[in-house]
């Protein structure tokens, strides 16, 4: 009994030592594993940070220098993913860099995988929208843009959704898709505070580009209430009023601009045409009967020349009996009524001025249909007629 007891104790001791040794080895393994993974993640984060720096540098450059930095960013992001292959942030930045480098197919593949895992990501939807727009697949672009607008954003979601919708508007307008852009611009305007002058200015410009003249004029009036001398707002308001046929209002805005601004290419023709229209318009308030009659007589003389020139241009005989074309019909009408539309007659019978000017407008319309839109003073009369038809409708 006494001889076997030490042997039993030594077996227990050996077992205990083995267990302790195993625990120490497991602890060391866990420690080294943590140190390894920490080192790997540190390397991955360093590679990712370098990729971000290269990407930011590329965005500030152009040409070959930009391409070189995007190439460096791609290498950095790929290296980061080699150390941390499941990191979605690394994958997203790699996809964005691929897209910036023109490698849309590769970028789309990464982004679609990410979208399947995070369908509510605004950033992923936006990048997919941009790729689709670049490749002229506008149905997909619209879908992804809408997804980005109504998706989640990590910070300041209201501002990001506004920016995305603005980008959608610009994308459509740059492709000439004015009708498709119009409702998006309206939605953008509805989400723009009236006291945010910077954003409201952008909206007003987009309203002009989508030919929503009333909304544009309203937006510019709001802006001018805060800054009455803002030149771009005065110019935009003048253009909107001009397109609405509100020529007196347009001139009021143009007159508030410095002469140098009115003479710039974007306004010179508008200002000149507004002036011509107001000089020719016999319906302006405050004019004497004599001036109204003289303006109407001048318009009648002008359209007489217009109809004759247009007939020569199109090879029509104005003596055709019976008249067959609109141009021939308005010419025959002038021969019948010309003697009743002298300045003295129109001054004596001012109620006949409406009929005389209606004839002027019918001549300009007939000539425009036969020979194209008029220029100079004829264009002034043509536009005046169009604006009055809208008012009287």
Tell me what each language-model feature is.
Residues 103-106, 136-143, 170-180, 211-215, ...:
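Alpha-helical linker/edge segments of TPR/alpha-solenoid repeat scaffolds
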Residues 2-83, 88-89, 386-392:
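N-terminal leader/linker segments that initiate helical-solenoid repeat arrays
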Residues 41, 85, 119, 153, ...:
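Short coil turns that delineate tetratricopeptide repeat
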């Amino acid at each position: 009994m006494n001889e076997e007891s030490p042997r039993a104790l030594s077996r227990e001791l050996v077992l205990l030592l083995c267990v302790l040794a195993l625990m120490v080895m497991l602890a060391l393994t866990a420690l080294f594993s943590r140190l390894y993974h920490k080192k790997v993640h540190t390397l991955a984060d360093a590679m990712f940070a370098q990729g971000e720096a290269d990407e930011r540098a590329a965005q500030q450059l152009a040409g070959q220098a930009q391409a070189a930095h995007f190439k460096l960013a791609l290498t950095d992001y790929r290296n980061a993913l080699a150390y941390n292959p499941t990191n979605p942030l690394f994958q997203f930045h790699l996809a964005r860099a691929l897209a910036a480098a023109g490698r849309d197919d590769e970028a789309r593949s990464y982004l679609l995988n990410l979208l399947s895992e995070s369908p509510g990501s605004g950033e992923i939807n936006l990048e997919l929208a941009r790729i689709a727009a670049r490749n002229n697949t506008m149905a997909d672009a619209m879908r992804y843009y809408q997804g980005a607008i109504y998706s989640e954003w990590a910070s300041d979601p209201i501002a990001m959704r506004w920016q995305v919708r603005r980008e959608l508007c610009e994308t459509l307008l740059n492709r000439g898709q004015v009708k498709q852009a119009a409702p998006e611009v309206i939605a953008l305007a509805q989400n723009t505070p009236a006291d945010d002058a910077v954003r409201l200015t952008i909206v007003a410009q987009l309203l002009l580009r989508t030919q929503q003249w009333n909304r544009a004029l309203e937006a510019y009036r709001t802006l001018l209430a805060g800054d009455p001398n803002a030149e771009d707002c005065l110019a935009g308001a003048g253009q909107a009023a001009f397109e609405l046929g509100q020529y007196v209002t347009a001139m009021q805005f143009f007159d508030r601009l410095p002469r140098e601004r009115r003479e710039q290419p974007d306004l010179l023709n508008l200002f000149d045409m507004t002036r011509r229209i107001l000089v020719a318009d016999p319906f302006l308030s405050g004019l004497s009967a004599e001036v109204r009659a003289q303006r109407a007589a001048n318009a009648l003389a002008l359209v007489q020349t217009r109809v004759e020139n247009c007939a020569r241009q199109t090879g029509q005989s104005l003596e055709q009996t019976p008249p067959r074309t609109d141009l021939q019909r308005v010419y025959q009408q002038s021969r019948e009524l010309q003697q009743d539309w002298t300045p003295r007659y129109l001054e004596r019978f001012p109620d006949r001025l409406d009929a005389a000017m209606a004839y002027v407008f019918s001549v300009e319309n007939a000539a425009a249909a036969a020979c194209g839109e008029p220029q100079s003073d004829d264009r002034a009369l043509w536009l005046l007629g169009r604006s009055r038809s809208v008012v009287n409708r």
